[in-house]
Amino acid sequence: MVAAVLLGLSWLCSPLGALVLDFNNIRSSADLHGARKGSQCLSDTDCNTRKFCLQPRDEKPFCATCRGLRRRCQRDAMCCPGTLCVNDVCTTMEDATPILERQLDEQDGTHAEGTTGHPVQENQPKRKPSIKKSQGRKGQEGESCLRTFDCGPGLCCARHFWTKICKPVLLEGQVCSRRGHKDTAQAPEIFQRCDCGPGLLCRSQLTSNRQHARLRVCQKIEKL
């Protein structure tokens, strides 16, 4: 008799226990999904470090974890710190630098072809729109340029990160770089300097300090 009662109770409790387990599984999966989605956002600035604002088609935007190396991307903010979005793929800074520099050179070539009357290729990357200077006005220090002719007196057009800006021509005693000289492939010259001013030459310092001897500075040309 007792065995029959216990068997009946176990039969009644089994469905109830299964329902409790199913409910717990559903709740834990929902919590995990919510934690993975993160908080809602309007832009990347609303998210914490190593997160970006993901905007799905059928859902509200939310903060998602940044994407690692060689993952698909649409902008730099989607990639984790230390990487950039180049050609829709998260790429290291070292690998991205030569690619971006090559694109800049191609953009400069495209602009030159357009001014000489040759057709511009459609597959060339488009230059970001910039504020046009009034006709005849030369660029001031820090303003964007394409060539030194675009800059005012005492300035030259030199590379600064992934663009070109007007920078001051170097004076006597200022650190300089040999014209056309490039650093190693791991550290390309993305901060170009202007040439030395008139009557000056870029050459190594004459000093007993080995560390300072490696520096090249603008010096007066000695008359023979």
From Swiss-Prot:
Assembly, per entry: Interacts with LRP5 and LRP6.
Family, per entry: Belongs to the dickkopf family.
Record field: compositional bias (Basic residues): 126-136
Keywords: Cleavage on pair of basic residues, Developmental protein, Disulfide bond, Secreted, Signal, Wnt signaling pathway
Domain comment (free text): The C-terminal cysteine-rich domain mediates interaction with LRP5 and LRP6.
Keyword Nucleotide-binding recorded: no
Region feature (DKK-type Cys-1): 41-90
Signal peptide: 1-18
PTM remark: Appears to be not glycosylated.
Organism annotation: Homo sapiens (Human)
Name this polypeptide is given: Dickkopf-related protein 4
Molecular function terms, GO-annotated: co-receptor binding; receptor antagonist activity
Short name of any one Pfam family annotated for the protein: DIKK1-2-4_C-subdom1
Gene3D superfamilies noted in UniProt: Lipase, subunit A
Disulphide linkage map: 145-157, 151-166, 156-194, 176-202, 196-218
GO BP term (any one): negative regulation of hair follicle placode formation
Tissue distribution of the protein: Expressed in cerebellum, T-cells, esophagus and lung.
GO cellular component terms given for this protein: extracellular space
Matches recorded under CDD domains: Dkk4_Cys1, Dkk4_Cys2
